[in-house]
Amino acid sequence: KADAISKYDGQLTFSYNADSGAKPLYDAVVNQLKNNLGIDAATNPIPTFQEFRDAVTNRQMKGAFRTGWQPDYPSAENYLWQLYSTAAADGNGSNDGDYKSPAFDDLCKQAAAASSTDDANKLYQQAEEILLNDLPAIPLYYSNASGVASLNVKSGYAFDWQNRSEE
């Protein structure tokens, strides 16, 4: 189906910073694409996070590359606007793929001006539908924090909305 939409010739590369410990993950992605879909894929490890970010910031990446985001506050806006708005593209923010959609931007602006959180979230969900159709990024994995609990433990750790521990 993908070839019917847009034929792709050549090798698909996945760049990541080699000092992250993510090699097994990207090797697995490449092997899945090769073995299951017959896509010529390869990893492109970049030695350090600094070199990796410099290449992303300077728009020197070829092919797919890893990104990540940790929200500053618990709101859809902190993900959507920061990562996909036109205002955050072209080196002006964290829209590293330089995605641009006036319809997406308009919905996010309406959501930011909404009079209630529920109204804002409905608009953000509509904006997410645009992202789902345009697919400017493909989530490959999500990092989680793990914890255990027991009635026999009197104090311990709790995790906040950013998966950071609180004592």
Per-region residue spans from a language model:
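Short, solvent-exposed loop/beta-turn-alpha elements that line the ligand-binding surface or hinge
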Residues: 3-8, 54-60, 81-109, 113, ...
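Structural recognition of the beta-strand scaffold that forms the well-ordered cores
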Residues: 12-16, 42-44, 63-67, 138-141
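Periplasmic binding protein-like
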Residues: 34-88
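Solvent-exposed loop/turn segments at secondary-structure junctions
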Residues: 18-22, 49-50, 70-74, 130, ...
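Small-molecule-sensing regulatory modules
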Residues: 28, 126, 133, 159-167
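Soluble non-cytosolic domains of exported or imported proteins
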Residues: 19-27, 46, 94, 98-102, ...
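Append "and occasionally in soluble cytosolic enzymes with long acidic Gly/Pro-rich linkers
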Residues: 1-31, 35, 126
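Solvent-exposed, polar/charged alpha-helical surfaces in well-ordered, non-transmembrane soluble domains
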Residues: 24-31, 35, 50, 54, ...
